[in-house]
């Protein structure tokens, strides 16, 4: 017998995605975790508790506000209450042509009632380093102010619920 209903897991994941990746409301996103959650971020380390996650995510996303997340796919494991998803950490190229991406995979474990009890994030470190370097060089060549513009020109080919507007200012209110 499944631990959680598939429809509940799907709805919780869509809310998680729309709140964080699309809406970029990091306070509301942190509230989707249990008070005692576990979070392992491959680069930044381990965190314990919702407030630790909030204290980490807000300054990171402010510092790297030009990055957005393009959905590729997700799978649901009803028996274990898990959602695994694959995405691209994306920056629009300052020339207006193309994107600079590095892929990531995350594993969410559901606690019920719309909350997550754990998350593990993994991404391609070498590809991240290349994308960061290429973006910095492209900004110097094409548009030094590009990071402040927070463009979101290419959300990819995911379903409608996984995409937002063309700039950070156009992000939808999710609450």
Language model segments and positions:
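Short acidic-aromatic low-complexity motifs
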Residues: 2-35, 170
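A structural signal for well-ordered alpha-helical scaffolds and beta->alpha junctions
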Residues: 10-13, 50-53, 101
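Tryptophan-centered motif/residue detector
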Residues: 17, 21, 25-29, 44, ...
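A solvent-exposed, acidic/Ser-Thr-rich amphipathic alpha-helical stretch
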Residues: 6, 26-83
């Amino acid at each position: 017998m499944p631990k959680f209903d598939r429809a509940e897991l799907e709805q919780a994941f869509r809310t998680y995605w729309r709140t964080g990746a699309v809406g970029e409301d990091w306070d509301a996103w942190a509230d989707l975790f249990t008070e005692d959650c576990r979070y392992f971020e491959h680069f930044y380390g381990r965190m314990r508790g919702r407030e630790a996650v909030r204290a980490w995510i807000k300054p990171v996303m402010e510092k790297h506000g030009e990055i957005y997340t393009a959905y590729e796919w997700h799978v649901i494991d009803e028996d274990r209450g898990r959602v695994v998803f694959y995405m691209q950490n994306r920056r629009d190229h300052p020339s207006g042509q193309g994107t600079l991406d590095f892929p990531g995979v995350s594993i969410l474990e559901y606690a019920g009632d719309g909350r997550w009890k754990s998350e593990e994030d993994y991404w391609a470190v070498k590809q991240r380093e290349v994308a960061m370097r290429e973006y910095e060089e492209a900004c110097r060549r094409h548009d030094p102010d590009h990071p402040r513009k927070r463009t979101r020109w290419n959300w990819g080919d995911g379903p409608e619920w996984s995409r937002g507007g063309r700039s950070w200012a156009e992000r939808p209110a999710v609450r």
